[in-house]
């Protein structure tokens, strides 16, 4: 389906979703949101896709919500359409925790890993979206800010829950209350990002690492481990332990387990089926 504000590509078992408003530093709009959700759902359904990458066109990842919308709300007030968009999420999914069915937390409920390839400025809502990705890989030029307090806003869309769990409570409060800007080096120290790569050739480097992830480990294991980790955030140790036993028994009966042992013993590259 033709898109207006995103680009969707699949290559080497990696689906890349590119936010495509480079002249606006990929500021977030209702159209972009709908297209990203559709692309993510398509990638999740596609058996040829094992890893999802979310990135931005041009020199930015996402500059947050489009300022024309914020300006309109500031001068004209909230209307029903804006209020509906604030509350909107995807269609309910049976068997999936409500925590993983909100507007952006739906990324956590996907079976496939989502990598934020942060190629430049990432602020406000853009940072919220990056937090809900499983891995955050940044270019040296990336800059980050929560921004909300500088706009008279609050920690939006669950950021007050996610950010402390990623960087710790003291640093989360620092970033939220001050809304200060940090560079990629400090973001790495804070563990806001997992890795920092050179700016030159960033997109190609990210694709190379994503392909490595897609080809070297079991997609079944990726999905189960991801679910274990995020579900574990709401469990006791005993509950997490018991779930791991159930999943261990299932994994020992899987085709990917047999292939995992076989490729190691035969000293060859794995050919995982995801089953």
Please annotate each region the language model reported.
Residues 56-106, 122, 152:
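Glycine- (often His-adjacent) and acidic-residue-rich active-site loop
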Residues 103-111, 117, 123-176, 205-210:
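CoA-thioester-processing core
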Residues 22, 137-142, 193-242, 255, ...:
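C-terminal long alpha-helix characteristic of the crotonase
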């Amino acid at each position: 389906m033709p898109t207006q504000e995103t680009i969707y590509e699949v290559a080497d078992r990696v689906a890349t979703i590119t936010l495509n408003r480079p002249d606006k530093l990929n500021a977030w709009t209702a159209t972009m949101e709908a297209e990203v959700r559709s692309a993510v759902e398509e990638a999740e359904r596609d058996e040829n896709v094992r890893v999802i990458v979310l990135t931005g066109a041009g020199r930015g990842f996402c500059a947050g919500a489009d300022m024309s919308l914020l300006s309109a709300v500031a001068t004209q007030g909230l209307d029903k359409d804006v209020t509906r968009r604030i509350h909107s999420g995807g269609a309910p999914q049976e068997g999936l925790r409500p925590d993983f069915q909100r507007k952006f937390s739906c990324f956590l409920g996907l079976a496939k890993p989502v990598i934020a390839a942060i190629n430049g400025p990432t602020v406000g809502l853009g940072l919220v979206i990056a937090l809900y990705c499983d891995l955050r890989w940044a270019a040296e030029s990336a800059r980050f800010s929560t921004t909300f307090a500088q706009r008279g806003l609050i920690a939006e869309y669950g950021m007050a829950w996610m950010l402390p769990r990623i960087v710790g409570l003291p640093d989360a409060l620092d970033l939220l209350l001050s809304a200060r800007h940090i560079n990629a080096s400090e973001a790495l120290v804070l563990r806001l990002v997992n890795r920092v790569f050179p700016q030159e050739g960033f997109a190609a480097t990210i694709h190379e690492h994503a392909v490595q992830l897609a080809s070297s480990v079991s997609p079944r294991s990726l999905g189960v481990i991801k679910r274990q980790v995020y579900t574990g955030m709401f469990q006791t140790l005993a509950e997490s332990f018991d779930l791991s036993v159930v999943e261990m028994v299932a994994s020992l009966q899987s085709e990917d387990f047999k292939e995992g042992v076989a490729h190691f013993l035969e000293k060859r590259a794995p050919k995982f089926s995801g089953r």
